[in-house]
Every structure is written in structure tokens, then in C-alpha cells.
């Protein structure tokens, strides 16, 4: 397994961070907090229901910064962004909680989830079951597993931990080898295809289109990175890909939710889906 250099650096720091967190709050206490957290909102179901109707199932990302682009949004208020996304028609939220490389925080996830009725995925680099239980404790409804960061044994262990605490799993792949490993190891219905090459950082929507034929029909494909305009959306939809994870394009907009609505819904007669809280 060839792990990109940037990812190696992130994972090394993540191992230190998990050890620090465990020293501050032991697993038993995190498990207690997880048991008392609000019930999960059904992340996978929210996406599947939209996709079955052939409607855009958008996971809208709340991300302050990235290692390659620096700060994406100076005026960064997670609750405000979450409400904007909900009004714009998002199906789910993705919130970055990695501190050192993405300027994220657990508090951002809590604030975003409290401000809306949408399910939330904790976007972080998961390498330890402790983080999975912690995700449930801070209110996440789903966790992300990045295949390029994990071996098959650990990937299966993390997915089993997620299931045990009621979390959905979004597995992320970048190429055919990772896809094969994910399908062999996990039974999650959510398969994310990241169109960004982690070695070169180049983005190509062809990555999703190339891998599509290898994915069983009972899995929902989520295309990640590189969706910038209506033509990109239509390219995916004509290939029957209806689930999208979009972050940077929204974060750079004055009104993230309005940009979401413009990109995915405006040419459909302005119908906004899921804008009314349950």
C-alpha cells in the first residue's frame, strides 16, 4: 500500500493526537458520553432517499482551511453555514474536525449539528476505534474511512466499532485497488470516490466515471472533489451518480447555501429539497 507523503505526515500526527486525547479522557468516559448523545439522524438513509428519486443528494462540507489551499473562509461560523446549507437543499453535512492540518474542531461539528436537522459526517483521519466512539460522543451520525490510510484489518475493526455505536460509514477510495479492498472488507452502502489524486493533487472527474462499472448497484456512489459547475453535475447525473460531496466551491462563496442551490437546484425550477426542518 503506497501512502502519499502528505498523508503519511497527517497520519503520524494523528497517532500522537489520539494518544493525547486518550490521556485526557479515557475510553470508558467517551463511551459514557456516546451513550448519552442524541440519537443518530440516519446519514445513509438521507442520501439514499434522494438518490432513489434521482435528485441531488448533496453532502455540504464545513471546512475552514486545507493543507494545500490554506484558509478557505475567513468569516467562519459553523452554525450559520449549517443553516445556510439546510436552506439551500443539502441532504447532509460534512464537518472537518482535524485541528492541525484543516483548522477544524470538535466544537464545529457540535455547533453545526445543533443549528439544523441534517445528519453529519465527522470528516477526519480515523485510525483508532477511540475516534469512532468519540465521533458518536460529539454528535456525529457517520464517520469517514479513507482506504489509503488503513490496512484491511484496521478498516474492518473501525467499521465494526462504528456499527456498534450506531454510526453509518462512508468509505473513501481513490483508485481501483482501493475500491476492491473496500468492497471486499466493508458492507457499507456508501462508497465515496475522491477525484483528487493524493499523490499529485490533480483532480479529474474521470476517476468516478472509470470506477463506476466496478461498483455493485446496491452501493451508493458519492463523488468527491472537482464539482465546480452545472456541467460537472450533469456529467455525473447522466451516469446515474446523484450523491455529491462538495466543500471548497461553497466555502469560497459569500453565501454557501445560495451557491449550493445555484449549482444543484436552480435550473430545476428553483425547487429546494429538504429545506424545512423535520
Curated annotation (Swiss-Prot):
Pfam families in UniProt: IGPS (PF00218)
EC number(s) recorded for this UniProt protein: 4.1.1.48
Pathway: Amino-acid biosynthesis; L-tryptophan biosynthesis; L-tryptophan from chorismate: step 4/5
Catalytic EC class: lyase
Keyword Translocase recorded: no
InterPro entries the record matches: Aldolase_TIM (IPR013785), Indole-3-glycerol_P_synth (IPR045186), Indole-3-glycerol_P_synth_dom (IPR013798), Indole-3-GlycerolPSynthase_CS (IPR001468), RibuloseP-bd_barrel (IPR011060)
GO MF: indole-3-glycerol-phosphate synthase activity; phosphoribosylanthranilate isomerase activity
GO biological process, one term: L-tryptophan biosynthetic process
Record key words, sorted: Amino-acid biosynthesis, Aromatic amino acid biosynthesis, Decarboxylase, Lyase, Tryptophan biosynthesis
PROSITE patterns named among the record's database cross-references: IGPS
Reaction equations catalysed: 1-(2-carboxyphenylamino)-1-deoxy-D-ribulose 5-phosphate + H(+) = (1S,2R)-1-C-(indol-3-yl)glycerol 3-phosphate + CO2 + H2O
Family membership noted in the UniProt record: Belongs to the TrpC family.
Family matches, as PANTHER family: INDOLE-3-GLYCEROL-PHOSPHATE SYNTHASE, TRYPTOPHAN BIOSYNTHESIS PROTEIN
Name of protein: Indole-3-glycerol phosphate synthase
Originating species: Pseudomonas aeruginosa (strain UCBPP-PA14)
